[in-house]
Amino acid sequence: MGPTASGKTDLAIALARKLPFEIISVDSAMVYRGLDIGTAKPNEEELQLTSHRLINICDPSFPYSAGQFYKDALSEIKTIEIRNRTPLLVGGTMLYFHILEQGFSDLPTADETVRKKIQEEAAQHGWAKIHERLNAIDPKSAARINPNDAQRIQRAFEVYETTGQPLSSYQSLKRFKALPYQFINLILAPENRSWLHQRIEKRFDQMLKNNFLEEVRQLYNRGDLNSDLPAIRTVGYRQVWKYLSGEYDYETMRHKAIAATRQLAKRQLTWLRRWPDAKWFNSEDKDLISQVVDYLKGIGM
């Protein structure tokens, strides 16, 4: 586990080449075919050398859910077990990790810092404006909430700001139980936040050089996709989509995509700091791979 751009995929591939692991992607965007550059998906050569399960399994028009992931991941884990190998779950969609390991029963607890921030914004702009913003990130919840219902708007927005997942995605998870497996939680993150921020900016600029705009343009030109679909709401894709529709100019698109990616990383780190029984590794360490391999061998892997 780790924030976006922390080096999870490279580490996972290295581990799978050294140990009897098979990788399962835990990423709500990599499931979609055609979302390659903007998700930093492993390339064809990497996928041939080390297979990744739950990558490229559905069309962007399909609203893939946490519930569907739970079922798919369980099936893949069982398949890997039959092969007498160990599943290596890799990604940054914290809700997916959460329902596998801890199950799901209640909504996330309130975060007073986030709540205060939302209240200050509402005092300045009004709850109707906050409702408009909610509609952009969680249209299902926004459709059920009156624009003047401050309490429900605040809670829905708070859940998203804290977890990076819309409230509506939680409301379909009450039936899921934690899987009956022992999880070894490894968290990869840099100690220096500025390192991650710089890496996020450099990575997005490299995506643009690698024809990310053309990738999104192909999706845009299909005609059957829209900005409310989970695939298109993915960080980076959402901003380029607005650029293609004329809502943003190029520099605004770039700035907002980088800022949104940094906010995503912040939300992911909020989840991770609360994660029980986790071993942290520093993304910046040059001997990272050997550190992780030694740790895993030391606990009997």
UniProtKB/Swiss-Prot annotation:
It comes from the Bacteria. ATP binds at residues 2-9. Residues 27-30, 151-155 are annotated as: Interaction with substrate tRNA. This is tRNA dimethylallyltransferase. Coiled coil: none annotated. The record marks 93, 115 as: Interaction with substrate tRNA. Its cofactor is Mg(2+). Monomer. Catalyzes the transfer of a dimethylallyl group onto the adenine at position 37 in tRNAs that read codons beginning with uridine, leading to the formation of N6-(dimethylallyl)adenosine (i(6)A). Its EC number is 2.5.1.75. InterPro entries: Dimethylallyltransferase, IPT, P-loop_NTPase. Pfam families: IPPT (PF01715). It comes from Coxiella burnetii (strain CbuG_Q212). Belongs to the IPP transferase family. The keyword Lyase does not apply. It is an enzyme of class 2 (transferase). Substrate binds at residues 4-9. Keywords: ATP-binding, Magnesium, Nucleotide-binding, Transferase, tRNA processing. One of its GO terms (molecular function) is tRNA dimethylallyltransferase activity. GO terms for biological process: tRNA modification. It catalyses: adenosine(37) in tRNA + dimethylallyl diphosphate = N(6)-dimethylallyladenosine(37) in tRNA + diphosphate. The gene is miaA. The keyword Repeat does not apply.
